């Protein structure tokens, strides 16, 4: 499976670990997606490693395997949560079971939702609450968090990596072509 991660490199340090859902026919239960959609997630490999978002519960094992292969034995420092809708956040608890020393990065609304969705998840000492425009240095990669409330849900934020000029936008991407 390591070979798959190698093929999914965005840059030398950014690896796509998302999953594809070819069976879904409606995005958000209303928009036709005849060829399915992708749940986006990435690993940023730097002095401190970050994982961007989780995926739908149905794809948890595949996603965790993708993450494991991208990490190649390393341990993530951060899991960055940009959106708490269940098809993006369902695997937070599973991720923390596999990587219990990881810190979760999110805004205050994110953590309110996490405590409501995952009542048994103990994040004592593992929360990094960010404010709008706050930066997080991973090493050479510097991430800036930009809040976008009600673009979709109230806690939504996007993350900009100024090193590689990459925006992580959290949402699944419906497509008219095969992903």
Annotate each predicted stretch with a short phrase.
Residues 2-12, 106-156:
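Metallo-beta-lactamase
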Residues 83, 88, 141, 152, ...:
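Histidine-centered active-site/metal-ligand motif
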Residues 7-67, 71, 158-161, 165-168:
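Conserved beta-strand hairpin/beta-sheet module of binuclear metal-dependent hydrolase folds
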Residues 58-105:
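Active-site metal-binding motif and surrounding structural segment of the metallo-beta-lactamase
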Residues 50-53, 77-81, 145:
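Short catalytic-loop micro-motif centered on adjacent basic/acidic residues
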Residues 14, 54, 84-86, 173:
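Conformational gate/switch positions in structured elements
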Residues 169-175:
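Conserved small/polar residues in nucleotide/adenosyl-binding loops
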């Amino acid at each position: 499976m390591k070979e798959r991660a190698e093929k999914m490199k965005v840059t030398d340090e950014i690896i796509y670990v998302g999953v594809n859902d070819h069976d879904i026919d409606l995005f958000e239960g209303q928009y036709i997606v005849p060829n399915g959609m992708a749940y986006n997630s990435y690993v940023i490999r730097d002095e401190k490693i970050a994982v961007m978002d989780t995926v739908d519960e149905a794809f948890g094992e595949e996603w965790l395997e993708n993450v494991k292969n991208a990490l190649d034995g390393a341990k993530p420092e951060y899991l960055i949560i940009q959106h708490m809708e269940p098809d993006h956040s369902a695997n937070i608890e599973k991720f923390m079971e596999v990587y219990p020393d990881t810190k979760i990065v999110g805004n205050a609304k994110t953590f309110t939702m996490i405590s409501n969705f995952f009542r048994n998840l103990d994040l004592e000492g593992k929360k990094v609450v960010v404010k709008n425009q706050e930066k997080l240095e991973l090493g050479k990669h510097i991430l800036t968090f930009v809040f976008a409330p009600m673009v979709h849900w109230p806690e939504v934020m996007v993350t900009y990596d100024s090193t590689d000029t990459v925006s992580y936008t959290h949402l699944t991407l419906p497509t008219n072509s095969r992903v």
